[in-house]
Regions:
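Short glycine-enriched loops at secondary-structure junctions
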Residues: 6-12, 59, 100-105, 154
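Extreme N-terminal starter segment of soluble prokaryotic enzymes
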Residues: 1-4
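C-terminal accessory domains and tails appended to enzymatic cores
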Residues: 189-264
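Glycine-rich loop at the start of a catalytic domain that most often binds anionic cofactors/ligands
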Residues: 60-73
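Active-site rim beta-loop-alpha module in soluble metabolic enzymes
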Residues: 139-201
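A glycine-rich helix N-cap at a beta->alpha junction
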Residues: 71-90
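Active-site glycine-rich loop that binds ribose-phosphate moieties when present
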Residues: 82, 118-143, 151-155
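Short catalytic helix/loop segments, enriched in acidic residues and glycine
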Residues: 19-43
């Protein structure tokens, strides 16, 4: 059984501010915290029956996980400019997806909430407002892989359950404001992630891939109106529908996803 882990950083316990998620005095600590939560998910996946685990480093430069500290049984994709970005490698025949360290969508309550980048105000596909968890789970669905588990703050967990239904979740911290949270004790967090990953993998037959029916209509609202004109001028098929919003339509979900990657 093959399990795929996409790992972000903003939803990791102890991380509450953007300064912790990029190069600076606190960054090495954040990398260690991220690696530990990923390791907990790996341990749980193998305990639940996984025979192979692939981790895709999915935050910013995508060179965050400390490979020498990573569970030796897992392989790692690192580096950015990947065709499927945060979901690179999910097309290689996996049985389930686990999202670690994820966060709420742009504009929603949640610690460091955003959607792929700070320039995005909102993303809608076929009327559904999506964050990274929703979008990436749908990408997995394109390859017939179900989302089985997600970790992050309590708002991320609510967002995931609202869209995907009975997916296993672990809330590692409680949202207070966009830059404040109450994190659970780390030993408790790692124990919970490991146990939940084991449960999710053991019960993997209970999960179904999430798909939306095509054709697909995407609307993206930007924080800065100049980006609307730039996207419409440079990307074939993209149209400005108002001063801050573009649209793109396709019969293929992955085409929509790749256009979003191009503008985010």
């Amino acid at each position: 059984m093959k399990i795929y882990i996409s790992a972000d950083m903003e939803g990791i316990a102890g991380i509450v501010h953007g300064d912790q998620t990029e190069e600076g005095p606190e960054f090495m600590q954040s990398r260690k915290l991220m690696t530990e939560e990923v390791n907990a998910a790996i341990r749980g996946a193998f305990s639940g029956g996984a025979t192979e685990v692939l981790v895709n480093d999915s935050h910013n430069t995508m060179r965050n996980i400390i490979i020498e500290d990573l569970d030796h049984r897992a392989s790692l994709i690192s580096g950015n400019k990947k065709p499927l970005s945060m979901m690179e490698g999910v097309d290689m025949g996996f049985d389930g997806v686990i999202l670690v360290g994820y966060h709420a969508r742009a504009g929603a309550p949640g610690v460091i909430s955003h959607t792929y980048s700070g320039i995005i105000r909102s993303l809608k596909i076929n009327g559904y407002e999506l964050g990274e968890a929703g979008l990436n789970g749908l990408v997995a669905g394109c390859f017939n892989v179900p989302l089985i588990m997600a970790t992050g703050d309590d708002k991320l967990c609510e967002e995931v359950r609202a869209f995907f239904g009975e997916v296993e979740t672990v809330a590692v911290k409680r949202y207070i404001t966009r830059s404040a949270a109450q994190s659970r004790p780390l030993k408790e967090v790692y124990k919970d992630i490991e146990a939940t990953a084991k449960k999710a993998v053991k019960g993997i037959k209970n999960f179904k891939p999430k798909r939306l029916e095509g054709p697909y209509a995407m609307e993206v609202a930007f924080q800065n109106i100049i980006l609307t004109d730039m996207a419409a001028a440079r990307i074939p098929g993209v149209k400005a529908i108002d001063s801050s919003t573009i649209s793109f339509n396709s019969t293929e979900f992955l085409d929509v996803f790749k256009v979003f990657l191009n503008i985010s």
